[in-house]
Amino acid sequence: MSSARTPLPTLNERDTEQPTLGHLDSKPSSKSNMLRGRNSATSADEQPHIGNYRLLKTIGKGNFAKVKLARHILTGKEVAVKIIDKTQLNSSSLQKLFREVRIMKVLNHPNIVKLFEVIETEKTLYLVMEYASGGEVFDYLVAHGRMKEKEARAKFRQIVSAVQYCHQKFIVHRDLKAENLLLDADMNIKIADFGFSNEFTFGNKLDTFCGSPPYAAPELFQGKKIDGPEVDVWSLGVILYTLVSGSLPFDGQNLKELRERVLRGKYRIPFYMSTDCENLLKKFLILNPSKRGTLEQIMKDRWMNVGHEDDELKPYVEPLPDYKDPRRTELMVSMGYTREEIQDSLVGQRYNEVMATYLLLGYKSSELEGDTITLKPRPSADLTNSSAPSPSHKVQRSVSANPKQRRSSDQAVPAIPTSNSYSKKTQSNNAENKRPEEETGRKASSTAKVPASPLPGLDRKKTTPAPSTNSVLSTSTNRSRNSPLLDRASLGQASIQNGKDSLTMPGSRASTASASAAVSAARPRQHQKSMSASVHPNKASGLPPTESNCEVPRPSTAPQRVPVASPSAHNISSSSGAPDRTNFPRGVSSRSTFHAGQLRQVRDQQNLPYGVTPASPSGHSQGRRGASGSIFSKFTSKFVRRNLNEPESKDRVETLRPHVVGSGGTDKDKEEFREAKPRSLRFTWSMKTTSSMEPNEMMREIRKVLDANSCQSELHERYMLLCVHGTPGHENFVQWEMEVCKLPRLSLNGVRFKRISGTSMAFKNIASKIANELKL
């Protein structure tokens, strides 16, 4: 085993020197042993391997990175593998990558995405991250609208707990937003994407503008230096408002308008928001950063602890690491690991295959199938993975409950070497399906309890939640006739694309258009009360000036913007009559997370409407619809970094390859294929098209409708079709999956839609048309 690596030095915000790579692995010869791929004699349709992970499919792409859904071969646990091409990163980008890595390695909180393993070659870095199967909070809001305050409180307590934990470790996130909040299989929060995070010291100011403009604190727009935590506190206020109201407190048709509204500090309070919640917001959204509450103070707030009077939210106390769990140790010994290397890897925080196996054995599976895991013996070719830093990663919802059937639709990854195939011998062990007390700090019974989500996935409603009834009306408050965001009809009309400026491709994320149009029709006109801040900053125009040595955009975030199979994000409403909302799209620079180095471009664009970017020849702006738009008036598309004037790259316009068992498959493979059954979806509320028809009949109906709409399709699995519509290279081109799934505990089947590539609007148009024409 190699010795512990020297930790990365603290990086200055302005420092742009080339970081040394020696800390990643001082022995280049060991790198070649870190990866084992497929034996050339294995079947052609077998998925490639990286280390102990079988790659299942691509779930995100960027200019310099890619994310693959993978399965840990030894334990069967699903993970996300982020593949970063180091040769494409400049020195500044490498610095931020290493800083992100260092930060992720010291964070052990149950509501923060966890790093498992790092594998490095000379040109490529493979990062194995925790997998959150529930998708983004953003997608949940898109599909369901605002949360009731009880649900919002459960989520927000977890968010505050995790962010306060970061602050007590002198780490500031700087990019908190609904898109960076994930949900696991039990609907618990997982904070992701620490690419803009940094270490702070009170008295040493940070001076870089970074973050997403709608969530950015006013002092960032003014170009002031910051301590750090106060900008996270402001962003948390925006998040709380978004959870409870379903809209952003500050928006505008362009960056200049947004900036003016943030600096004015005025926002609308919807009538249904409780007084306690309104009072809490006033502690977050204070223009003067020195007067904003600390998170320790926020934890004691009345609204935060409603229903938790005997369990007041307190700072999380990280439990002592558990490096000697006898159950996991014995399991690993039975796989072929020695007790000495297990202890050395854990105590030394190697982040190698040994540590990853130990951690994964302690993690609860996101699978629906049960409490058993199949363990395989360790491969004979020993691996020693480098203890390299690892960036944060956006984890994704599972796309397959059966690894035998999953075939990757894009198996091209950087530098996957070949190696001997794995042993076929396996042994089954009944293992607890819960997380034991372990070194990651994910112990539910620690000194400060981690806020739990009271909403198990199977109890989710399929329809959009009704308006909250816990309104506190004040007769002394002037009320507007506009609603912040309750027009649910538009939820079925827009779709989302996720990503970050100049890195994430449109195909890195699926889109959504799921909601019931009937809900908003029955709603009375909503009223609002207004609240304005008492501090009015100078009305300067534009964003703060930049210097030539400001930070440049980080390269490591694109793969993190890809909860591809979010249960709430990929199902199409059958209603398609509501108007499209595009005044606040996710795919434009005005909503992108960026560093100060990008401000020159931003200033050039700040007078453009949100729906138009200079890169988009076809972008057209719709008139601003006031405060009454749906969440799609804020979030209609994800960030797109590819210049839309450029044609689709070959990597994006993939030719669909059949992955069904054909003439090259064995008789056993063919038999397994014939006997395959629809997989069960954990979240019943993600099913929008349900039927009591037999799965085979549903597949025939789907193919019939696809043919009628000139859509090409190929059988990817027994009950999954890969579909294509439009002309490659054109805006109407879209690829998506249609899968027949079983609803747990019900005698019904449903159809799941998931976008693979193409614009969100193109996907929405064809998917809505198909959903409407299906006769199920």
Swiss-Prot record:
Span of domain KA1: 727-776
Domain UBA: 323-362
Enzyme class: transferase
Modification type Phosphoserine: residues: 40, 91-93, 212, 274, 408-409, 453, 483, 490, 566, 568, 589, 616, 710
GO terms (BP aspect): establishment of cell polarity; establishment or maintenance of epithelial cell apical/basal polarity; intracellular signal transduction; neuron migration; positive regulation of neuron projection development; protein autophosphorylation; protein phosphorylation; regulation of axonogenesis
Activation and inhibition: Inhibited by PAK5; inhibition is independent of the kinase activity of PAK5. Activated by phosphorylation on Thr-208. Inhibited by phosphorylation at Ser-212 and Thr-593. Inhibited by hymenialdisine.
Gene3D superfamilies membership: DNA helicase RuvA subunit, C-terminal domain, Kinase associated domain 1, KA1, Phosphorylase Kinase, domain 1, Transferase(Phosphotransferase) domain 1
Protein name: Serine/threonine-protein kinase MARK2
The species this protein was found in: Mus musculus (Mouse)
Lineage of the organism: Eukaryota, Metazoa, Chordata, Craniata, Vertebrata
